């Protein structure tokens, strides 16, 4: 089934966001593991795996719509030197992704592609949950301090 050209391009933009997020999250996850923050390492690693699943769905949909998945595109990866900066960088990336998903949902609706819209809506809900979790972590750091927050991240 031949998909709308604008929608296919938007799906490839989303794919670049997801592929970038995978790399950024994996680096942050491994940095946390290296610092002994095992709980945070596992949470961020799980997030990277979820982003891989998002990328897989996008690739499948692009192929179904007779497009070419552009896996050679990555956005700028922002690696934080410490946990608070990592959380801030990840939150910024999630806000960008959330907006892009909502733009893509509107476009899918405009071109009458309900199955793509439905897929995107499900992923947008998961991205919204990512934003919530990151904001919660930042709130905890503000409320209890970075030292206590990090001491709570050493256990799985």
Where are the model-predicted features located?
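Iron-associated oxidoreductase/ferritin-like identity signal
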Residues: 1-156
